[in-house]
């Protein structure tokens, strides 16, 4: 179906592709599902309005406001048939293996489209994809209410994880962020922050938890593996959830 793009976010992956790519964009041959290769239009965090629908489209109709799940899957491999299409052996991504939403219009399969409720504006619809990443990370941690969590990075994914944990009932959340501007933004939402340039984060968390460590830690900053190891030291090792975003 053809979608008129309303809003499209710029993901960290887009920046890496632009400055250092091709990384995920097929360079040596067409993608096995989409048949596309470079050059491609990027953009996968978006919302829009359906303006054309093919004859086999039944779930949405022209005029519907939608958010798009950007995953292409074959539907035939073992992960796909078992319901784990995010592990498809030929997985593709809209805006990386097919022309994306940094354009006025883009075309996607029906299986990737989700109708927005009337209460959700298109501006918020563009946040569905990145916020689903944040929510998934929060759920993967297994953390429950009345627990302690650390989030490294107060960018969009870090903020999303903070919201998700709050919604799950987690009461003690510290956000580690070196940027004063980003600290101010998430503090305005009610978050507690730690400046790693001013305090020793593992030491602070150890003091707060009687040496036990946080119940979960999330990397929403995108850093080197050796730094991840250090960041996980203030968390209980079984509940460190690294590499959630950038």
Walk through the language-model features, giving the residues of each.
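Short, flexible surface segments
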Residues: 59-62, 145, 236-237
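Short Gly/aromatic-enriched secondary-structure transition segments
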Residues: 16-23
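Residues in the short beta-alpha loop(s) of Rossmann-like NAD(P)-binding domains
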Residues: 21, 178-179, 246
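Glycine-rich cofactor phosphate-binding loops and adjacent beta1-alpha1 units
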Residues: 141, 184, 189-246
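Glycine-rich beta-strand-centered segment in the early N-terminal region that forms part
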Residues: 2-8, 23-78, 117-119
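Receiver (REC) domain switch-region micro-motif
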Residues: 66, 149, 213-217
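NAD(P)H dinucleotide-binding glycine-rich loop of Rossmann-like/cofactor-binding domains
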Residues: 30-44, 72-152, 183
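Mid-domain Rossmann-like dinucleotide-binding core that forms the NAD(H)/NADP(H) cofactor-binding site
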Residues: 120-199, 203
